[in-house]
Amino acid sequence: MPQNEYMERWRKLHGRRLDHEERSRKKAAREGHKASDDAQKLTGLRAKLYQQKRRHEKIQMKKQIKAHEERNVKSSAPNEPSTKPLPQYLLDRSNPTNAKALSSAIKNKRAEKAAKFSVPLPKVRGIAEEEMFKVVKTGKKTAKKSWKRMITKPTFVGPDFTRRPVKYERFIRPMGLRYKKANVTHPELGVTVQLPIISVKKNPQNPMYTQLGVLTRGTIVEVNVSDLGLVTAGGKVVWGRWAQITNNPENDGCVNAVLLV
């Protein structure tokens, strides 16, 4: 017997501890806690190696789960035609189509959702932070700090906006790049109207840009459409509607948008 199998030899000769199963169960139950503890407390190279190991484990686990799911799915047609004749009472039954029906239902639902929330510009170019912000140095000559940023793109601020004190203002939005109105085109009516902007709903670049009210190509803004006289099915006047910016406001000097209907 090879020298490295002494543990197996001992087990064959003397058997296991009487509480072996209980100890194994408890050890397996503690593994989750130990993994969590290591993930939080390890630092440096050991942490990197540990995270790499965990990543590979998770990838393998996901592959295994996917394989199990594919194995359990009932296919729409049998892999090979059956050679045995079916009895009379089974002839009217179709082959199992659970997976096919479920798949088509999910696809239809996704298509409806996509149509409901479709926008004129589904993809936009990413904007780097260097392009979005200009570093502003502040402080005395001997100790200049570079923690302030000036936004180089057009922005929207509400009517009740007040600047923070200069010492605490991290992001500067220049007055010359603040916009209050947008040229909104109604796609069905084919008219373009200048409407006041109410708020910035979503900037596709970054959630922080949404908070700052940055207006870039592809941004979703809410505009006041009360001038258009749109009404709901119940007869109420529509006040605010969403629109997507279709031009580059920093180049054109104006905000052009298409109403989402």
Curated annotation (Swiss-Prot):
Lineage: Eukaryota, Fungi, Dikarya, Ascomycota, Pezizomycotina
Main location: nucleus
Keyword rRNA processing in record: yes
Region (Disordered): 1-94
GO cellular component: a single term: nucleolus
Subcellular location(s) per record: Nucleus, Nucleolus
PANTHER family to which the protein is assigned, alphabetical: RIBOSOME BIOGENESIS PROTEIN NSA2 HOMOLOG (PTHR12642)
Placement of sequence motif Nuclear localization signal: 10-17
CDD domains: NSA2
Subunit architecture: Component of the pre-66S ribosomal particle. Interacts with NOP7 and RRP1. Interacts with RSA4 (via WD repeats).
Name listed for the protein in its UniProt record: Ribosome biogenesis protein nsa2
Family: Belongs to the eukaryotic ribosomal protein eS8 family. Ribosome biogenesis protein NSA2 subfamily.
Chain intervals with Basic residues compositional bias: 51-65
Compositionally skewed regions (Basic and acidic residues) per UniProt: 1-40
Keyword entries, A-Z: Nucleus, Ribonucleoprotein, Ribosome biogenesis, rRNA processing
Superkingdom, natural source: Eukaryota
